[in-house]
């Protein structure tokens, strides 16, 4: 694949996924988008995506639950959670004690800033996985 990387974007807001797809593809990334976390899980391709961009609050399955299910399929896939809300790490640890994630992106975000965060995550070393 000649792209900068492959990204799976999952957000229940169609305008967000379309804007991310357009902006990321124009910056050289391959992008798949889903507005339904269940459909994203059912169509997930192991060893294909370099990074998941997953909204925290979605109907049917929240972003943390989706990532936990995807991690059962592919432990190497990195994730950045996207949210319009403040993230409270202490409360998050109580609900998902095994979740090891350090990348949270606040919406709205400019595409240039998103690209920088994605590049940093894709190229970061992940010793545990």
Protein language model regions, located:
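Active-site residues of response regulator receiver
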Residues: 11, 55
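Hydrophobic/aromatic residues positioned on beta-strands within the core alpha/beta folds
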Residues: 82-84
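Alpha4 helix (beta4-alpha4-beta5 surface) of REC/receiver domains from two-component response regulators
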Residues: 65, 86-103, 112, 116
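Two-component/phosphorelay signaling modules centered on CheY-like receiver
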Residues: 14-32, 99
